[in-house]
Each structure stands twice: as structure tokens, then as C-alpha cells.
Amino acid sequence: MRRNEYTHRRRHISNRHLSDKYYYAGEHETATGIRLTQYNEQSLHTKEVRITDTSFSKLSDSDQIDWFEVSGLTNADAITRIVKDFGLHNLDAKDILTPQHVVKVEEYKGRMLIVLNSCYYDVNNEMRSEHISILVANNTVITFTESNNPVFEAAHKALLSNMLNIRKKGSGLLLAFLLNTIIANLVESASKVEEILEDIEE
């Protein structure tokens, strides 16, 4: 246990300095997995992506919207490869791999990276925190989460039902749905905490 704690502390400290390589500094042990959802007005399909794929950007289809869901940040090398494959930098990978990072939005030419933290209630009605990053590169959206909990299930349902003609629109509307899901989770969590506090006061 002490060795694990020391390793966690060492990795957390290493992410504070400039480096060619960073590590996931969180507590989740979820193995990194990648799911790709591609859609347009006529079709929608989802598949698993191998982490060993040499180029993730080549999996994108310019005629569709491509949504890569990266669940689990333990494979820091894969996270870094994805980030660099879409034209970002090692420091951006560092932000993605560092939970409780200050909320930030980085804009590059044709790309944007959003880093934030959220919380939600799981199926067991327990509050969970989640470090989330969203990378947008033209028609490609990549979400990074610490766990494989269905944080963006509402967005998937919107795609399946084609809510607000989402499959006809660009990646901007998908981003809006993802951010709306995060905000909804925060509002729900705040409401439940408020109810708990009111019960305690009574």
C-alpha cells in the first residue's frame, strides 16, 4: 500500500514539470478503452478502436462526424499519442492526465481543448467525481474520462433519436450536447446535496 501511495505521489509531482512524458495522476484504475461513433444524416454506427492503432486521425471520416470516447486514462502513452495525432502538444496531454486541474479552454487553429471536472450520481445513488477533457478538431470530437461510467449516455440517446436534427449538424452541436450533459449532472448533484443538507438541518 505504501509503495502504491508513493508511486501515485511521485507521478503527481512529475506532472508538475515540463517533460516529454507524463503519467495519469488520478486514482481510477480503469483500463484505457476507445469507442468511435461515426454519424451523418443518413447513418450512425459505433465500433471499438484498438489502442495499438498507429494513427487515430486516419480513422476519422471527413464525410461524417467522428466522436472518439476515451474511457480510462491509465495508458498515458496512448492518451499522448491521440493528443499529438490531432495536432496538440505534450502539455495538453499533461492537462488531460491531471485530475482536479483548473478549468481551462485552449484554442488553437481549427482545434479546441476543454478541461474541466464534474460530478454525478451513479446507479447506486452515490456521488462520483470525474475529470473530463474534450478535444474538438474540425469534424472530430474526442472525450476523455477517467472511468467507463456512462457519463455521456444522454448524448448517445440524442444521436440515436436524432434529437434537434443533431446528426444533420456539425461537431459544434455534439459539443453543446456533451457540455449540457455535464452541466445537467452538476445541477442534479447540487440539488441532491442541498436536499441532504436540508434533512440534516431538520
Predicted regions and their residues:
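Peripheral, non-transmembrane regulatory/ligand-interaction domains of membrane transport proteins
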Residues: 1-202
